[in-house]
Swiss-Prot record:
Keywords: Acyltransferase, ATP-binding, Cytoplasm, Nucleotide-binding, RNA-binding, Transferase, tRNA processing, tRNA-binding
Binding site for ATP: Q141, G163, R164, G165, K166, S167, T168, L169, A170, G171, K172, R288
Name of the encoding gene: tmcA
Binding sites annotated in the UniProt record for acetyl-CoA: I411, A412, V413, Q418, N419, Q420, G421, I422, G423, S424, R462
Protein name as annotated: tRNA(Met) cytidine acetyltransferase TmcA
Species name: Haemophilus ducreyi (strain 35000HP / ATCC 700724)
One Gene Ontology cellular component: cytoplasm
EC class of the enzyme, as a word: transferase
Family, per entry: Belongs to the RNA cytidine acetyltransferase family. TmcA subfamily.
Length: 598
């Protein structure tokens, strides 16, 4: 049985022991590794630092009968200490995190883990050497190895919690199929497939997902391949959809309870979008540790991954709802949900007090004029204010940062209650509640940002939101362009939204994404090449400040169309054939347009 020990100080280490010390941000390099013990050092110069994702990764590396030591001074008051990790998820501000650490402490007590200044057992010794493990497949793995190749389904989804041998199984399956089929492999990270390749003991061609899509689009790869997708839920859904609908047979593996937040909503969403026969296979038997391992159970409850336990508090219930209804819900989301500043929640329950749906929102705007102008000029990028800053930069709308707004970060409805109007009613109730609660200083607008699909665009339009921006490129996390929509509340907000819509629609036909999204948007757009005052303001910020090419794309395009012969330096921006030294080229572009600024 594995152990977790909380230590208040770092004890002396025996001679001959070499510790491999790494920053929390590099924890992913330990995925797939196994150790008899590990140290997780929470100490920080200004308090503590607890990266939940890194902690979950390290838990998964501890072998049976191994120990994870958590170094935490003043454990008795940990919930009162400043957690420096909050800088990542709390708008750049470190804060105390009482709600999360109360949750943490409750579970330490529940599972009876040791909290001490000195461990009862001898501390870290030189690890014993173990003979190399021979691969022995469990009955579950053997069953899949025998039955999956004979099953006629076109899509096979292998799911399991961590440490169940998915990658080993996938490697053996790939080896079997390679005897008669052309087998290829893809994954979110090439580093994650080493276990598959080691088990397969043959060379399986690997392609990054975007490379594979490019080969499909240029007709350089046949559909007559068998594709393995490792940790499929880490890959954006639109990419999975294209891959899953192209190759003749696809085998996906993914972790159901994962530090990366793959979410239980993954299978629901993927299967709906794949119009092919599908079969699911599951692994339950842990290989790295024993059944009912306390450390695994503790971590699952810490990350709110246990479906069988009914959450006691509203935050935990809401997190479960997000995990069920959304594609990705991460450990960082959990930390933010428990303790981040500037958050707002609105939920609705049925008569049995079951959480039906909820909105998670954050406050934005009300920044000073000096800061707003610095953001517009490209000189400042403070954390937070996602939509407000984007509209200020990409939309050339400085006032977006100064007005008072609320951004709907997440909206979720229980999967069995979707498409019944509950989400729309929730949005209506939330907006009425926000207006009522902000009478002293009225809200100017409510915003939302989401991966643009026809379904979601229709939903938000039906609820009165107006489209004001679309990201020029697809977001790596979702695989979609992100849309930003606003609902005006105050008179000032109405004037602002009217202006934002007008500018967006004026620029739309010149945007690089317009041909792709034209049918989805259903907005009649005409090319308008004549410069106006907003364009000149935009170009002044590009030429004499630090506004980016993306921020000024349409204004630069209008200027280029009018003065093409004199501004050949701008051509790469519109042909997407950039010079090798882009930094030098960018500065040359800034200088080149200065004579044209009015």
């Amino acid at each position: 049985m594995r152990q977790l020990v909380i230590l208040s100080t770092m004890p002396p280490i025996q001679g001959g022991v070499l510790l491999n010390s790494q920053n929390f941000s590099k924890a992913k390099q330990f995925l797939g590794q196994e150790y008899p013990f590990a140290l997780y050092d929470m100490r920080s110069e200004n308090g503590i630092c607890f990266n939940l994702e890194a902690f979950a990764i390290i838990v998964g590396t501890i072998q049976e009968n191994g120990t994870l030591y958590l170094i935490c001074p003043n454990w008795h008051s940990v919930e009162q200490q400043i957690d420096v990790d909050a800088i990542r998820w709390n708008g750049g501000v470190a804060i105390a995190c009482p709600h999360f650490f109360q949750h943490f402490k409750r579970l330490i007590n529940k599972f009876g883990f040791e909290v001490t200044s000195r461990p009862q057992q001898p501390f870290i010794k030189t690890a014993p050497s173990y003979p190399a493990k021979l691969i022995q497949f469990t009955d579950e793995q053997q069953n899949i190895l025998q039955k999956l190749p004979l099953d006629p389904a076109e899509i096979h989804i292998i799911t399991a919690a961590r440490g169940r041998g998915k990658s080993t199984l996938a490697g053996k399956l790939a080896e079997q199929f390679a005897k008669t089929e052309q087998v290829i492999l893809t994954a979110h990270r090439s580093s994650s497939i080493q276990k598959i390749l080691q088990t397969a003991s043959i060379n399986i061609p690997f392609f990054a997902p975007d490379k594979l899509l490019n080969l499909i689009e240029t007709k350089q790869i046949s559909a007559d391949h068998l594709l393995f997708i490792d940790e499929a839920a880490c890959i954006p859904l639109p990419i999975l959809q294209q891959l899953g609908n192209y190759f003749k047979k696809v085998i996906l593996t993914t972790t159901t309870q994962n530090y990366e937040g793959t979410g239980r909503g993954f299978k629901l969403k993927l299967v709906k979008q794949l119009h092919r026969t599908t079969k699911e296979w599951q692994l339950f038997q842990p290989l790295r540790w024993s059944n009912h391992d306390r450390l695994e159970q503790f971590t699952n409850e810490l990350l709110l991954l246990n479906d069988e336990l009914i959450p006691l508090d509203q935050n935990s219930q809401f997190y479960h709802l997000l995990a069920n209804a959304h594609y990705k819900t991460t450990a960082t989301d959990l930390r933010r949900l428990f303790d981040a500043d500037q958050q707002l929640f609105h939920q609705c329950y049925d008569k049995n007090q079951r959480l039906m749906a909820g909105i998670w929102a954050v406050k934005e705007g009300e920044l000073s004029q000096d800061l707003a102008e610095a953001i517009w000029a490209g000189k400042r990028r403070p954390a937070g204010n996602l939509v407000a800053q984007y509209l200020c930069c990409q939309g050339n709308l400085i006032e977006a940062c100064q007005l008072k707004s609320i951004r709907i970060s997440r909206i979720a409805v229980q999967p069995d209650l979707q498409n019944q109007g509950i989400g729309s009613q929730l949005v209506t109730d939330f907006m009425q509640k926000m207006q009522k609660n902000n009478k002293n200083r009225p809200l100017d607008f409510i915003s939302v940002s989401f991966g643009i699909t026809p379904h979601l665009l229709t939903f938000w339009r039906r609820n009165g939101f107006q489209l004001v921006q679309i990201t020029p490129t697809k977001e790596a996390s979702s695989g979609y362009h992100s849309a930003m929509m606003l609902y005006p509340l105050s008179q000032q907000g109405k004037q602002f939204v009217t202006k934002a819509v007008k500018q967006f629609e004026r620029d739309l036909a010149l945007q690089p994404f317009y041909p792709t999204l034209k049918n989805c948007l259903a907005i009649p757009a005409q090319v308008e090449n004549e410069m106006n005052q907003d364009d000149w303001q935009n170009l002044h910020g590009f030429a004499f400040a630090q506004r980016s090419l993306a921020n000024c794309y349409t204004s630069l395009k209008r200027l280029y169309i009018t003065h093409q012969a004199q501004l050949t330096i701008l051509a790469p921006l519109f042909t997407h054939r950039y010079p090798a030294n882009q930094k030098v080229w960018l500065q040359q572009c800034r200088i080149a347009i200065r004579p044209f600024i009015q």
